[in-house]
Each structure stands twice: as C-alpha cells, then as structure tokens.
Amino acid sequence: MLLRVSAVVLAVGLLSGCALFDSGPKPVASTYVTLSDSSAGYALLYETVSKQKRTNLLSYIKKETPELKALLERIAETSRATADELEALAKAAPPLNLTATRLPKMELAARESIEKDTRKDILESKGVDLEFTMVSSQLSGLNYAAHLARSLAAVETSAPRKAFLQRTDRKYSQLHDQVYKMMYTRYRS
C-alpha cells in the first residue's frame, strides 16, 4: 500500500513538473513596465482589434448563416469602436505609438503564416466548414484581445486608460463567451 501511494505521489509530481516538490514561492512578474513596453502592448492590441474590425467583410464574398453574420457584425462593431478609442487614447499624454509592436522576426513570420493559412481555409470552405473555421479563428483572436487588455490594465497608471482597458477586457471576454457558446452548441458531435 505504501509503495502504491509513493508511486502515485511520484507520478503526480513528475506529471505536474515537480510543482509539488518546489521549495518556495515563484517570483511574481514585475508590474513595472517601461513606456516603450506599454506602448508595444497597446500597439499589439490595436493591431488585433484592427484585424477584428474587418470580420464582417466575409459576407461580401461568402454566404454565412444569419447567426454567424450577426456575431461577426458584433465583433466588427466592437472592434471599430475599440480601435477608435485607442487612437484617441494614443494622443493623450504620454503618447503611445500604435504601430510599433516590437515583435521578433520569427514571431512576425509565424503570425503571417497562420493568417495566410486561415485566409486560405476560409476562402476554400463553405457551409459548416466555413462557419467552423471562422468561429474557431475568432475564438483565439477574442481571447488574445481580452487577455492583452487585462495585462495592460494591470500595469496601467492612467485612470482613463485603465478604465478603457478594463472595459475592453470585459467586452472581448463577453464576445469570446458568445463565440464559444456558438461553437459548442453548433459543432459538438
């Protein structure tokens, strides 16, 4: 019996990355960021919502269900409003550069490759396959936008910007939940 318990504890420790045997608390990530880091975070958020604001253009080239069309329209409208508000906030002191994401070349290449594959999948699909591709790609984009806004809000010192980021987190989290619900109810087997 003792051997069995020891084996289970060892297996759990190995599978959990030995977190059970960790000797102390992990260091907390610094909440201090430079203006350059913060600006790059805002630029990433701006880039993300700028792409999301075009999601409703799919209806010009593809036929989608009314439910998907309405959902994509909500995402596009939320993203347009968010992009506009980001542009206004970027002009306030201290100003933000919404074009400098400062991503490494390999990250940029990976993102470009993913976008190219997703575009190809969307253009070549129809019906349920089209919907599933659109919904799954939106799911990851909305999740990223919500978490990026949340991370920026955690370090933002300007009250108006912090409030904007918290609203943005809530909006994109709600949209993410709506997309997830659609995906779960329509495509589970």
Label for each model-derived stretch:
Residues 1-7:
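Bacterial N-terminal signal peptides that target proteins for export
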Residues 14-17:
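C-terminal motif of bacterial Sec signal peptides marking the signal peptidase cleavage site
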Residues 19-189:
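His/Met- and acidic-residue-enriched segments that coordinate or traffic transition-metal cofactors
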